[in-house]
């Protein structure tokens, strides 16, 4: 990652919006403590899994010098698993309003360096998924042309089927999850020592 002309290796974690047993209404001092502990262990980057974070969280990331991947959706049009009451029910009606709200709220945070359109959405392997990814990426780029767009992909081991490759090509940064699932394709895409 290039930051102010310097190459920076991102060493990060995924953080959900809650603080475990403290729940979702997290006191700012709890986030400050958690972020300080992460910084002490060498962490400099955070992915906000899988929903937009609280503004106070991003304020702390700005102050403490973290790089943030700001993520919005955990589900698009296709539902995950057997759950029948997820965001997929509302996606077509609400995606644009929700996305614009997040971008407009978060785009002035210097800590936000990457936008993430989603987490392991089933849409990545269906023909219609590329069109959804295109709409999301275009909206991100229109509202904020300064940051790259990604999506957490977990179906890489499925191969370059008719749906996955066009889906991946719409992302500025292709994020790969679960390297251990890739089997013989692992070395094509990933190496701990590769820069």
Region roles according to the model:
Residues 32-41, 45-195:
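Substrate-binding/catalytic cleft of secreted carbohydrate-active enzymes
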Residues 1-40, 59:
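N-terminal carbohydrate-binding accessory modules
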């Amino acid at each position: 990652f290039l930051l102010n002309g310097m190459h920076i290796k991102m060493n990060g974690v995924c953080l959900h919006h809650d603080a475990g047993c403290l729940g979702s209404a997290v006191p700012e001092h709890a986030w400050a403590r958690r972020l300080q502990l992460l910084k002490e262990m060498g962490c400099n980057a955070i992915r906000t899994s899988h929903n937009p974070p609280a503004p106070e969280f991003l304020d702390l990331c700005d102050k403490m010098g973290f790089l943030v991947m700001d993520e919005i959706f955990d589900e698009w049009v296709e539902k995950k698993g057997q759950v029948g009451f997820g965001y997929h029910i509302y996606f077509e009606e609400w995606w644009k309003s929700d996305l614009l709200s997040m971008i407009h709220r978060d785009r002035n945070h210097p800590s936000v360096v990457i936008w993430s359109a989603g987490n392991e959405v089933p849409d990545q392997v269906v023909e219609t998924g590329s069109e959804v990814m295109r709409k999301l990426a275009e909206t991100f780029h229109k509202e904020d042309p300064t940051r790259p767009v990604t999506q957490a992909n977990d179906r890489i081991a499925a191969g370059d089927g008719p749906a996955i490759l066009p889906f991946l090509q719409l992302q500025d940064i292709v994020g790969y999850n679960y390297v251990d699932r890739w089997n013989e394709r692992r070395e094509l895409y990933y190496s701990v020592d590769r820069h």
